[in-house]
Regions:
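Bacterial N-terminal signal peptides that target proteins for export
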Residues: 1-12
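SH3-family beta-barrel domains
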Residues: 27-57, 68-72, 79-94, 98-121, ...
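Second-shell loop/turn segments in exported
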Residues: 60-62
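Bacterial N-terminal signal peptides
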Residues: 10-22
């Protein structure tokens, strides 16, 4: 009987310690953020899912439309979330709010730079050129490794160095 009482007392003490100290919640548990509605990283790149996207001054339909994008698959950067709304930035630095349903996780980028950009057959500077692009061409991103991204443009796949693309971060890797 004495062993059972000791066991119950020790169990109760351990229960109180775990409850009062917050054990089981994780030492680095992230607190709920009312501005975040997903667990995806912020900032992150996405693309427009529709050929007509209203950009508003705030996160809701009650806010006036600032402008309208008419380019499906245009890359944009999500810089803030509020409920179903996303604050985005485009390649020119323009910022506004769009409904999350008008965005897609499919990755696109835009070629940038002052010179002609070469799309190569392999992720190497000495690789055979496949295409030459001017700035402002939209490309589908398939994967990014180190300093290269595998892209598709005009039904041709190849590799472009990340520093010639807007729509991917310098250290970002994905496939």
């Amino acid at each position: 009987m004495r062993n059972i009482n000791s066991f119950i007392i020790i169990g109760f003490i351990l229960f109180m310690l775990f409850t009062l100290c917050g054990a089981g919640q994780g030492a680095y548990a992230e607190k709920a953020n009312p501005w975040r509605s997903t667990t995806y990283p912020i900032p992150r790149f996405v693309s427009l899912a529709s050929s007509e996207v209203n950009v508003r001054t705030g996160p809701g339909r009650k806010y006036p439309v600032k402008w309208v994008y008419r380019q499906k698959q245009m890359p944009v950067e999500i810089i803030l979330e509020f409920d179903a709304w996303r604050k985005i930035r485009d390649q020119d630095g323009a910022v506004g709010w769009v409904h999350g349903s008008l965005l897609s996780g499919r990755r696109f980028a835009v070629s940038q730079g002052e010179n002609v950009i070469t799309v190569t057959s392999k992720p190497r500077t000495d690789s055979k050129p496949k295409l030459k692009l001017e700035a402002g061409v939209r490309l589908r991103l398939h994967e990014c490794i180190h300093v290269w991204c595998k892209v598709e443009v005009a039904e041709t796949k190849g590799w472009v160095q990340k520093n010639f693309l807007w729509g991917v971060y310098p250290q970002e890797k994905f496939d």
